[in-house]
């Protein structure tokens, strides 16, 4: 029987941190970060990374594990996170995954072996160029749907790496990715997933407040420091919301007001995409984070069936 992990997800600024820390303290959990930006060292303010005080309240994993110059893949996250989970459980503790990166959760719950037999760098580069063009992700996903509808249905168009890999395998072998031998794999652990939500107007107001606090805490200075340390502006990490909007300001290409406007707008759009993604996931408990019994609902859901 698979060991069960708890997962707390939801859009940015929905209150995941406070609830996860309470769960961790009460139920002897160690937190595994499920955020694609908090993995990067030196990117603290713009990623809303757990503070030193918060990290002192519970053991945190998968934070500060990569340099901003690295291209950290979903597959690498899956491998490292599963290793963390196994270690946590081997020591008799609970693993609580916390974050809003849907691709990471999908990789853990529905792992898909990418296959190493067929690979061609020129084909991959060609597909990557298409993906980088306007409407490119949609175009690639449509191509995949035409030749391999089963895999296309499984993969979101934003899962560009896996869409490209599926197309690459098809072009090299002439067989749909879904029909390749031993392609699909079973999840290593069982995941009990809860997602936070709240009225959109309140969520957007919280996003505005969070960004204002980030700016007060020195977000602009953090971006400048990263650039001066040699992190290229086109590094994958610097394309994250909070950094890509502030880079033009740090380089004198735009005003602070323009940068902040773009940052707040993009963050609202991102929160909306996060909610849309999670609604596609199966077996998710939705909890209004503003309800007085939000914690009690989470606790009851996670511990159901356990001996008291």
Kindly give the residue locations of the regions a language model identified:
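Phosphate/pyrophosphate-binding catalytic cores of soluble transferases and nucleic-acid-acting enzymes
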Residues: 1-308
């Amino acid at each position: 029987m698979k060991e069960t992990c708890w997962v707390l997800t939801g859009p940015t600024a929905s209150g995941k941190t406070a609830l996860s820390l309470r769960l961790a303290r009460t139920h002897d959990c160690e937190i595994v970060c499920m955020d694609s930006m908090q993995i990067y060292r030196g990117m603290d303010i713009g990623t809303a990374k757990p503070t030193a005080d918060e990290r002192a309240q519970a053991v945190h994993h998968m934070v500060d594990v990569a340099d901003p110059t690295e291209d950290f893949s979903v597959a690498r996250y899956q491998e490292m996170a599963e290793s963390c989970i196994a270690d946590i459980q081997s020591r008799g503790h609970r693993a609580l995954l916390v974050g809003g990166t849907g691709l990471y959760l999908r990789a853990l719950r529905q792992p898909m072996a990418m296959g190493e037999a067929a690979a061609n760098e020129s084909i991959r580069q060609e597909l990557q160029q298409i993906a980088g063009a306007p409407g490119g992700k949609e175009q690639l996903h449509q191509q995949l749907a035409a030749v391999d509808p089963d895999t296309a249905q499984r993969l979101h168009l934003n899962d560009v790496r896996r869409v490209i890999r599926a197309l690459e395998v098809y072009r090299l072998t002439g067989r749909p990715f879904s029909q390749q031998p031993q392609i699909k794999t079973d999840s290593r652990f069982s995941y009990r997933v809860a997602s936070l939500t709240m009225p959109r107007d309140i969520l957007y107001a919280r996003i505005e407040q969070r960004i204002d606090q980030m700016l007060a805490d020195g977000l602009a200075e953090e971006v400048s420091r990263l650039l001066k340390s040699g992190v290229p502006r086109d590094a994958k990490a610097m394309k994250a919301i909070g950094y890509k909007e502030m880079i033009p300001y740090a380089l004198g290409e735009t005003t602070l007001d323009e940068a902040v406007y773009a940052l707040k707008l993009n963050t609202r759009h991102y929160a909306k995409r996060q909610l849309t993604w999670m609604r596609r996931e199966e077996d998710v408990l939705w909890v209004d984070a503003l309800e007085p019994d939000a914690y009690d609902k989470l606790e009851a859901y996670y511990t159901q069936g356990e001996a008291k």
